[in-house]
């Protein structure tokens, strides 16, 4: 678990152009915190503790402005730079070493009006 956290911090340092060090990541990067919440919530989701998992992610959303469904599958070293408005749905599958920016929505499965 701690190795994963260290790798995630290192990934943010490498891909975040404004990051000055690990302490700044831990104190000031919402991406780091939303992923801490998501890892716990996803574990709970897989064990069918779904209301608790949803509640944890709602708290994370209020604190970070980033909305991630606890059922979403997210790989290692995931980084959201300027995460306000990011929405990741239940069906999203994100691999390792992925970076997202503000305003991205992933995971919708229902077709929109007038879509092909």
Each predicted region: which residue ranges?
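Terminal amphipathic alpha-helical/low-complexity segments used for targeting or macromolecular assembly
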Residues: 1-64
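Flexible, glycine/small-residue-enriched loop-and-beta-strand segment within the central core
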Residues: 46-116
């Amino acid at each position: 678990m701690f190795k994963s956290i260290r790798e995630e911090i290192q990934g943010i340092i490498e891909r975040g152009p404004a990051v000055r060090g690990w302490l700044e990541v831990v104190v000031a990067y919402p991406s780091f915190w939303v992923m801490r919440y998501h890892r716990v919530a996803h574990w709970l989701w897989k064990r069918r503790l779904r209301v608790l998992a949803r509640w944890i992610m709602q708290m994370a959303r209020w604190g970070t402005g980033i909305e991630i469904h606890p059922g979403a599958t997210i790989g290692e070293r995931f980084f959201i730079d300027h995460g306000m408005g990011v929405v990741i749905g239940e069906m999203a599958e994100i691999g390792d070493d992925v970076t997202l920016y503000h305003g991205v929505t992933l995971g919708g499965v229902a077709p929109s009006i007038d879509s092909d």
